[in-house]
Design a protein with these regions (language model features):
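Conserved beta-sheet core of the metallophosphoesterase superfamily
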Residues: 172-234
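Extreme N-terminal starter segment of soluble prokaryotic enzymes
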Residues: 1-4
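Conserved catalytic scaffold of divalent metal-dependent phosphoesterases
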Residues: 64, 80-183
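Accessory, non-catalytic peripheral segments of nucleic-acid enzymes
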Residues: 231-373
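Active-site metal-binding loops of divalent metal-dependent hydrolases
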Residues: 7-11, 45-47, 85-87, 130-133, ...
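Core catalytic region of metal-dependent phosphoesterases/phosphodiesterases
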Residues: 9-119, 186-188
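Hydrophobic beta-strand segments of well-ordered beta-sheets in folded domains
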Residues: 38-40, 78-80, 125-127, 157-160, ...
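Short, conserved loop/helix-junction motifs that constitute active-site signature segments
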Residues: 72-75, 151-154, 183-189, 266-267
Length: 373
């Protein structure tokens, strides 16, 4: 079975324009290679917020959804849409169903708002779907899944499409909420388990979090994209058109000319966050800095005044400033830790897979939280 999983598209987003999200999606997903897919999964958060029907965003979204249906219909691709976080989707993906009903040639479409198992007969595959915030009790979810398995007279499913978070993703979670148990789902699902919600792409054994298709804020400046699966192999497909959110660590020697060099090379409309000490001249004159870069969205994040030689806070570099979203002393610390553990301890294959899953989280862990001004 060939399929892709896209999630956390967030149409109607406040900071990343809907027009950009649609253009980015079109260039990255509606490709010649993806015309041979069997299934196109959207794993939640197609929308960012509840939208007014008279908004410009909605007009663009309706046209985009029609294009999505056309792409799937023309190429005989099944489209499966999962409800995401209630405060994002608000069951607005229902509009895709209505648009499809109006078409002369309809797409093979299903919109999953409930925990369910679907059997796709021509592919001979059972797919499990679980929307976000379905239950805060894992035992309850297991009971519901058991009932669905009995309805289909099966003991396992082939693929799972979820929205939420697994325990291994806890280090990147912004709050302590309900977490899925890895062992349970790895025993339940023969193939891959795909999960949306957290925007960072990670994996743990056969659990693959594709992350968001585009960037929505600072703190997620890593590569964005979606996941493509062919048989037993999966690959992360990067979105090279993702919106730019750039964090600049300002050091004592940084001047306005240095900022010019780095900011002016970014696409207009990019979001730029300056991390600087309260006593830095650029912080004191920050309003003038904002006026200088009117084509960009510039904000700041203050930290306590420190010397440039304080390597615990700064990444020591030869350049005037470091473009990064982390303050870790050794930016390759995950490699150091990985080499140390694998050389010192004898791990079996399962233990190695779990450990490497945690390392992949550490690689993307962001230590600086966004601050509005």
């Amino acid at each position: 079975m060939k399929y892709i999983v896209v999630s956390d598209i967030h149409l109607g987003h406040i900071r990343t324009p809907t027009s950009h999200i649609i253009n980015s999606f079109t260039k990255t997903v509606f490709t010649e290679k993806n015309k041979d897919l069997d299934v196109f999964f959207i794993a939640g958060d197609l929308f960012d917020r509840l939208l007014d029907f008279n908004s410009i965003d909605v007009r663009e979204i309706l046209k985009f959804l029609d294009t999505l249906l056309t792409f799937c219909t023309k190429n005989n691709i099944k489209l499966r849409v999962l409800e995401g976080t209630p405060s994002h989707d608000w069951q607005q993906p229902e509009v895709i169903v209505k648009l499809n009903e109006l078409r002369e040639t309809r797409c093979d479409l299903r919109y999953h708002k409930f925990l369910d198992i679907e059997y796709i007969a021509d592919l001979n595959k059972h797919i499990l779907y679980i929307p976000d915030e379905w239950s805060n009790c894992h035992e309850d979810i297991e009971t519901q899944i058991k009932e669905k398995l009995q309805e289909h007279s099966i003991s396992k499913v082939d693929v799972a499409i979820l929205h939420g978070a697994f325990t291994y993703q806890a280090p990147i979670a912004k709050y302590a909420g309900f977490l899925y148990k890895e062992d349970y789902f790895l025993n339940l699902v023969r193939g891959y388990i795909h999960i949306g919600h957290y925007h960072t792409h990670t994996f743990f054994d056969r659990i693959v979090a594709q992350g968001s298709l585009d960037r929505m804020s600072h703190g997620e400046e890593e590569s964005k994209g979606y996941v493509r699966v062919e048989g037993s192999n999966w690959a992360f497909v990067e979105n090279p058109h993702a919106y730019v959110y750039r964090t600049i660590n300002v050091v004592a020697s940084t001047t306005i000319n240095t900022l010019d060099k780095h900011i002016n090379q970014l696409p207009k409309g990019s979001h730029v966050r300056l991390v600087l000490s309260k006593d830095h001249p650029l912080n004191i004159a920050f309003q003038d800095v904002k006026l200088r870069y009117l084509d960009y969205h510039v904000r700041k994040l203050n930290k306590e005044a420190i010397s440039e030689s304080n390597e615990i806070t700064y990444i020591a570099l030869s350049e005037d400033l470091e473009m990064s979203d982390s303050y870790v002393l050794d930016k390759n610390i995950h490699n150091t830790l990985k080499n140390l553990v694998l050389s010192k301890y004898q791990l079996n294959q399962t233990e190695q897979n779990k450990f490497l899953g945690y390392i992949s989280i550490l690689e993307n862990l962001v230590e600086v939280e966004e601050e509005a001004i």
